[in-house]
């Protein structure tokens, strides 16, 4: 209950500033009606910074990577309190929920040092490049290919519905890298960090 009270008190204090800054409409669950506007993006980055500075971004991330190491119960409490207060999220949903955990699990130490702090702080915003014209969200049928070329990969294919793409600094890209016919489809893909 100490965590709930801490978060509740912080939200009570900071939601008033948020309402003054964005207006009543934005206080009811988001930055306002035009979420793609420059004004809405500035507001979202401002709010993300407040959450980050208070230690409420990436709360489930391990402490060694800048998170709180929150328990499942603390994550539930966080979500409940954010919803009760009609508090908007920050800019980092795909970075915090997808790119960051993947980098923690499979990335090099250099990648962890380079990307994780910037994901948490909101300095780098991430999008996903998964869906394709002929596959939609059926990821096993994606056709984009990545072929190794020295130290790099040459990517060839199409992506659609790039969630967050117009405001992103980085993308998580799913591309086929294994072409042997006997390999199951879901094992033919690699996960790329693309700028």
Residue ranges and their predicted role:
Residues 1-95, 109-121, 125, 134:
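Amphipathic, small/basic residue-rich leader segments at the start of a protein or domain
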Residues 64-66, 87, 131-135, 151, ...:
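Short beta-turn/strand-loop junction motif enriched in small, turn-promoting residues
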Residues 79, 100-103, 116, 172, ...:
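Conserved protein kinase catalytic domain
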Residues 90-100, 123-129, 158-171, 190:
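FAD-binding core of FAD-dependent oxidoreductases
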Residues 99, 111-113, 134-139, 162-164, ...:
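Short, well-ordered, mixed-charge alpha-helical segments that flank or form enzyme active sites
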Residues 107, 125-147:
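A gly/ser-rich beta-alpha-beta helix-loop segment of oxidoreductase catalytic cores
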Residues 110-111, 147-154:
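Glycine-rich, mobile lid/loop segments that gate access to catalytic sites or pores
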Residues 143, 152, 156-195:
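A short core secondary-structure module
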């Amino acid at each position: 209950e100490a965590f709930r009270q801490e978060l509740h008190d912080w939200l009570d204090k900071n939601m008033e500033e948020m309402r003054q800054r964005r207006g009543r409409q934005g206080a009811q669950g988001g930055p306002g009606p035009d979420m793609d506007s420059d004004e809405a993006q500035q507001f979202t980055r401002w709010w993300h910074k407040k959450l980050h500075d208070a230690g409420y971004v990436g709360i489930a991330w391990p402490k060694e990577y800048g998170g709180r190491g929150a328990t499942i119960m603390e994550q539930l409490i966080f979500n409940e309190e954010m919803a009760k207060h009609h508090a908007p999220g920050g800019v980092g949903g795909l970075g915090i929920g997808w790119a960051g955990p993947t980098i923690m699990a499979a990335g090099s130490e250099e990648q962890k040092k380079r990307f994780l702090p910037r994901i948490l702080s909101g300095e780098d915003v991430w999008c996903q490049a998964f869906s394709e014209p002929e596959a939609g969200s059926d990821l096993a049928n994606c056709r984009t290919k990545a072929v190794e070329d020295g130290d790099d990969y040459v990517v060839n294919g199409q992506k659609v519905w790039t969630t967050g793409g117009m405001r992103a600094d980085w993308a998580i890209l799913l591309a086929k890298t294994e072409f042997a016919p006997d390999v199951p489809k879901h094992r033919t893909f690699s996960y790329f960090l693309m700028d």
